[in-house]
C-alpha cells in the first residue's frame, strides 16, 4: 500500500504495445489506486528476455514479478490488455497477484492458433520510412489504428504515431508473438482470487474467451462500444472496470 493508503495496481500492455496505452486512464485511477504501468520485456524501453528463455506469458509473468519485487511490491492488483491480460492471469496463477482484471486477454482460445502466413510487423519494419510519413496523414493513421481501437479518431495524432512506430520497433515482438500463438491459457486449478475478464464488444482482433478457458468463478463483462484496446475509446469505462476489478484488499 502506498503512503497515501492507495493499493498498487500494475498495468500491463499487449503485444507490440507499451506502457503508453494506459496514459488515458492513469489520472482516473489515481484517486483510488497507485497505478504502475510498465513495459513488458522486449517492448517499449525494456530489453527482451535472455535468448534462451521463451517469451511465453508465464515467463513474461515471472520477469514482471521480479521487477515488482525489486520495487518492493509483492502482490499487487494486476490488470492487463491482450497479451498483458494473459500475463496478468499467469501472475494470478503463480500467487503473485491479489486480483486480476484482463481486458480482451490473449490465450483463451480453443487451441493454439499457429503462426500467421504473413508477418505484418516484418513488412512494416521494411517499409518504416514510408509508414512514418504516412502516419502524418490523419485518414491513413486512423486506418492503421482501426484494429486497435473502435474509435481511432479519439487517439491524439502524436500518440497514434508512437503506437504504430512502437509496434514496428519492438525487439520482442517476433518471439512473443510466436510463443503466444503456440500456447493456450490453462485455467485448471486456478487460485481463488478475484478475476474479471472484460471484452470490448467491438473488438476486431480477439473474440470472447472460450468458456473452458475461463478460471472458475471469473466474472465476465462485455464492454459496450469499445475495441481491443479501449483506453482511448472510453477511458472512464476502462477506469471503472479496473477499479471495480481490484476492489479487494491486497493479499498479505
Question: What does each model-identified segment do?
Answer:
Residues 2-47:
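Conserved HGGG/HGGXW glycine-rich cap/lid loop of the alpha/beta-hydrolase fold
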Residues 13-15, 76, 80-85, 200:
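Conserved alpha/beta-hydrolase "nucleophile elbow" surrounding the catalytic nucleophile
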Residues 23-24, 36-79, 83:
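Active-site loop/oxyanion-hole signature of alpha/beta-hydrolase fold enzymes
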Residues 27, 194-226, 232:
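Conserved loop-alpha-helix segment in the C-terminal half of the alpha/beta-hydrolase fold
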Residues 87-91:
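Hydrolases whose catalytic domains are alpha/beta-hydrolase-1, hotdog thioesterase
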Residues 93-130:
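Flexible "cap/lid" loop of the alpha/beta hydrolase fold
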Residues 102, 133-189:
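Conserved alpha/beta-hydrolase catalytic His-Asp/Glu region
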Residues 216-252:
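Catalytic active-site module of serine/aspartate enzymes centered on a nucleophile-bearing elbow/loop
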